[in-house]
Amino acid sequence: VESTNAASRLSPTQERTLDLLRRPTEPVIFDSDQIAAFTSNFSEALDHFVARLDALGESLFISKGMLTSVLGCETHFQQKEEFRWNVTTAIGTVAHRAIELLTGWRGAPYPATLVDESIARLSEKPNSLGDFLTSMTDGDRADLTNAATDRVVKFTESFPPLQQSFIPVAESSIRWPESGTIVLGGKSDLTLGRAEHGESRKVIIDLKTGGAWPNHMDELRFYALLETLRTGIPPRLIAGFYLDAGRAVP
């Protein structure tokens, strides 16, 4: 992200965020031989576990949520209850979809407009979330709209306007390898920039509410791993952005 003339019209919180995201004067370039060696070593280690799963006739998809759960408490991970959607669990998905719409929306839409559109689009999906959204009561809809709008408002208060020159992408999916017995996959909340000519320019941001926890950085490292395996170029910066505090933790 480069400096813009609009910086003089930003709030202190937005200026602080822009300072963090701004690309440094010196380009960030990782040693290509080291990256190639890392990828080779990682692939070799993964092949060991692939062989074990193939012998059992099983496959495995590794996600951020799975890693967080199993590293937090293996017993709880093995005995986890069936997931059910409710207002509390749907807030994050609805807010993230609204922010995704914001990155490509022309003009300056009201946060509530984005949330309404988010709910409408998610309701059309033939899945369990769509079923919940189409069947929820008026009271639940009001609670969900208010909570998701609060997150979108905090996002717009904390981030500078996402100009197209920033190359903003919300909910960007990454998987590696494309198929196989073991596949790693994730979806980052927000990415800015892109790698160019071997230079690391991409910034990966995970949006959070509440306080910071140690596993949050583990989740960001997982995204950085996926980006490195997919492109051969690590991201320039990974950061958790805490909406309630209006601050990023790189």
Where are these regions (language model features)?
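Short acidic, glycine/Ser/Thr-rich loop/turn "cap" segments at secondary-structure junctions
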Residues: 78-82, 128-140, 175, 204-208
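Hydrophobic/aromatic-lined pockets within catalytic cores
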Residues: 83, 99-107, 209-212, 228, ...
